[in-house]
């Protein structure tokens, strides 16, 4: 299998430690519901530290290693992966800190009215008065709900932090890369 486009690789988590003696790795997922990671058949690992959000560099491409996933399961809020070719604890420990990436095309189809946060990044955000608030720069979790960071995507300057709840996010139009929000431009 060839390396997917660098723009298409999405970071899903990082290996935090070895799990057991048989070469399993414990992954700290970035998502509270790591459905894509749990269903993956192939993952890519990068041992380089995380840069800013966005495309991987060509240097990073040269360090990517592909692994077939033999099994994946949840355990105490982490994902435990069994990777082909990693058969003992020492091999698993050598991967500690590696970032787990998955080809976006390998994600399972999102359920109706559900979205992968990565697909929201880069969307324009407008309010009900048709004022453009900016671009979606990031989406994070605060424990209660998602939070959308909106601002200038080219400089990563955040102007608004908006709760990702149905009372605020009125419409998500992924084909047109547009979110409609019940949010005033003077709310900071």
Curated annotation (Swiss-Prot):
GO terms for cellular component: cytoplasm; ribosome. The keyword rRNA processing applies. Keywords: Chaperone, Cytoplasm, Ribosome biogenesis, rRNA processing. InterPro entries: PRC_barrel-like_sf (IPR011033), PRC_RimM (IPR056792), RimM (IPR011961), RimM_N (IPR002676), RimM_N_sf (IPR036976), Transl_B-barrel_sf (IPR009000). It is found in: Cytoplasm. Residues 112-187 form the PRC barrel domain. Its main location: cytoplasm. The keyword Chaperone applies. PANTHER family: RIBOSOME MATURATION FACTOR RIMM. An accessory protein needed during the final step in the assembly of 30S ribosomal subunit, possibly for assembly of the head region. Essential for efficient processing of 16S rRNA. May be needed both before and after RbfA during the maturation of 16S rRNA. It has affinity for free ribosomal 30S subunits but not for 70S ribosomes. Belongs to the RimM family. Binds ribosomal protein uS19. This is Ribosome maturation factor RimM. It comes from Polynucleobacter asymbioticus (strain DSM 18221 / CIP 109841 / QLW-P1DMWA-1).
């Amino acid at each position: 299998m060839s390396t997917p486009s660098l723009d298409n690789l999405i970071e899903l988590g990082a290996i935090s430690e070895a799990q057991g003696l048989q070469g399993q790795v414990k992954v700290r997922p970035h998502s509270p519901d790591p459905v894509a990671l749990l269903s993956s058949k192939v993952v890519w690992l990068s041992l380089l530290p995380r840069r800013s959000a966005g495309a991987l560099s060509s240097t990073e491409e040269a360090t990517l290693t592909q692994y077939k996933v033999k099994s994946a399961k949840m355990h105490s809020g982490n994902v435990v992966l069994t990777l082909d070719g990693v058969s003992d604890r020492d091999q698993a420990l050598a991967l500690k800190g590696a970032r787990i990436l998955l080809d976006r095309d390998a994600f399972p189809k999102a359920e109706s009215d559900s979205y992968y946060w990565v697909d929201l990044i880069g969307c324009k955000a407008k309010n009900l008065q048709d004022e453009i608030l900016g671009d979606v720069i990031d989406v994070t979790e605060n424990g209660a709900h998602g939070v959308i960071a909106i601002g200038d995507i080219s400089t990563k300057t955040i102007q608004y932090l908006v709760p990702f709840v149905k009372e605020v996010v009125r419409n998500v139009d992924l084909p047109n890369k547009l979110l409609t929000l019940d949010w005033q431009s003077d709310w900071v």
